[in-house]
Amino acid sequence: IYHPGYVAKRLEIGAVVGAVPAKNVRREEPVPGDIIILLGGRTGRDGCGGATGSSKSHKLSSLEHCGAEVQKGNAPEERKLQRLFRNSEVTKLIKRCNDFGAGGVSVAIGELADGLHIDLNKVPKKYEGLDGTELAISESQERMAVVVAKEDAEKFLELAKTENLEATAVAEVTDTNRLTMEWNGKKIVDISREFLNSNGAEKHTLVTVTNPQPIVKSVKGKTNGEKFLNLADDLNICSKRGLSERFDS
């Protein structure tokens, strides 16, 4: 989008469309003893606060103060994940999976089963010095979490190596109906699934909804043909084919 409001925080949109034969996809409920494997990029402080940071108003000075909120993408690592998931031998091992977004380990792994025990010390780090909270909420990109049966875990780890992907067993499905996280031998999170599913205490607020004003844009040109060409010449409307062919190619 070409707009003065995006000078400091530019907007780029990219997408990948994938397809897998239905016979190669499992959709199963995790059972106690299943293993959660984290694969892809390592975890760092980049991404801590990313979900809220992306909604802030930014200016030129934001680069200095908010640079760590959203990580610069690592396209080659993403490509390796895509290549791995094209392998039917891999997808047939996966009971359930999640990508990492807002909330990091807490959400991406925390959503996979009702009862979970996560060992944060096993989460691969980009550098030392991260505490348990940072490991739990970091939104570092290029990461996936998959649930596999205990007997399939070693095979999955070996298959990940074929794409030069780092994969680590970091959590186990339990029958406790609680989400627990351990760091340096201490249990730092112990929350019941019943509470998590409640979304917390009820919140109420008063809002005033105003009707949006219609956008009236005058188009230069005497004839419809001239107006059409002038519209097509607008950077926000013209073909983006050139960009799409260069992006992550």
Please provide the spans of the model-predicted regions:
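Glycine/proline-enriched, intrinsically flexible loops and inter-domain linkers
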Residues: 1-249
